[in-house]
UniProtKB/Swiss-Prot annotation:
Mn(2+) 1 binds at D61, H63, D89. Residues 302-322 are annotated as: Disordered. Residues 304-316 have a biased composition (Low complexity). The modification N-acetylmethionine is found at M1. Its EC number is 3.1.3.16. Its cofactor is Mn(2+). This is Serine/threonine-protein phosphatase PP1 isozyme 3. It is found in: Nucleus; Cytoplasm. SUPFAM superfamilies: Metallo-dependent phosphatases. GO terms for biological process: protein dephosphorylation. The gene is TOPP3. The active site is at H122.
Length: 322
């Protein structure tokens, strides 16, 4: 894809900011197709377990909250001023999933060695068919466009290792994960199965009330106790697991004696919660600090799909559903 086309897409998307809101930006179907096919090729040339270096900024779920994505870049610096890793869940629930994913794909194409995207459980046809992205694509474009995005999502990497010490994924650990090579060897393109390693990396959750592995309230994958985090870090000589996938009140929350952190980057999630959003900055010495997007007072009318206009579970210590 020609650089000038990507530059133009980025310029138009960044130009959507209109005070505290963002205007809709209607890219052409041809532009979306170019973004998806170009990004897909880049994803497949890079490993499924990315090996990255600090300094880097890590963001959790954004869920179509495009104005908040722009706020993250205002806080952290627009690429390439900083390196970024996003932990998935770019689409669904919010009302500007198309703009959100298109800006992220455009940045990935333009700065492929400095800007990284992992797959979340919502980058999956069976999930985003229900929770809003399909409806947004169909209303604004066509079902064909949704399928183009699906093909791209099936090629996203699923985990990242920062300086061989911080392991990042969307969901969490898996009882099937014994060696990091098992992540490297997950084939792509792939749909997300309903069980197994790929499923767990995108769906599992920590649970402070259990030891070992437990049933997950989501009806998919497992929960895991602090003992499993400690055991995994010791076995693989790691310092920290960094994941997203759950709404947490302050935008970030530690678990297992600060050996795992949850990051969630969509403040006022779904227009219903009072949660803050956060971004984690990892410096050269692997010291982690947090930048917070405060929750706004006003709760807007949100989005497309199954949960539009419906209250969810309030964020709790330990996290609501992401």
């Amino acid at each position: 894809m020609e650089d000038s086309v990507v530059d133009d897409v980025i310029k138009r998307l960044l130009g959507a900011k209109n005070g505290k809101t963002t205007k809709q930006v209607q890219l052409t179907e041809a532009e979306i197709k170019h973004l998806c096919s170009t990004a897909k090729q880049i994803f497949l040339t890079q490993p499924n377990l990315l090996e990255l270096e600090a300094p880097i900024k890590i963001c959790g779920d954004t869920h179509g909250q495009f104005s908040d994505l722009l706020r993250l870049f205002e806080y952290g610096g627009y690429p390439p001023a900083a390196n970024y890793l996003f932990l998935g869940d770019y689409v669904d629930r919010g009302k500007q999933s198309v703009e959100t994913i298109c800006l992220l794909l455009a940045y990935k194409i333009k700065y492929k060695e400095n800007f990284f995207l992992l797959r979340g459980n919502h980058e999956c046809a069976s999930i985003n068919r229900i929770y809003g992205f399909y409806d947004e694509c169909k209303k604004r474009y066509s079902v064909r466009v949704w399928k183009i995005f699906t093909d791209c999502f099936n090629c996203l990497p699923v985990a990242a290792l920062i300086d061989e010490k911080i392991l990042c994924m969307h969901g969490g650990l898996s009882p099937e994960l014994k060696h990091l090579d098992e992540i490297r060897n997950i084939p792509r393109p792939a749909d997300i199965p309903d069980h197994g390693l790929l499923c767990d990396l995108l769906w599992s959750d920590p649970d402070k009330d259990i030891e070992g592995w437990g049933e997950n309230d989501r009806g998919v994958s497992y929960t895991f106790g602090a003992d499993k985090v400690e055991e995994f870090l010791q076995t693989h000589d790691l310092d920290l697991i960094c994941r997203a996938h759950q709404v947490v009140e302050d935008g970030y929350e530690f678990f297992a004696n600060r050996q795992l952190v949850t990051i969630f980057s969509a403040p006022n999630y779904c227009g219903e919660f009072d949660n803050a959003g956060a971004m984690m900055s990892v410096d050269d010495s692997l010291t982690c600090s947090f930048q917070i997007l405060k929750a706004s007072e006003k709760k807007g009318n949100f989005g497309f799909g199954k949960n539009a206009g419906r209250r969810g579970t309030p964020p709790r210590k330990g996290g609501g559903k992401g």
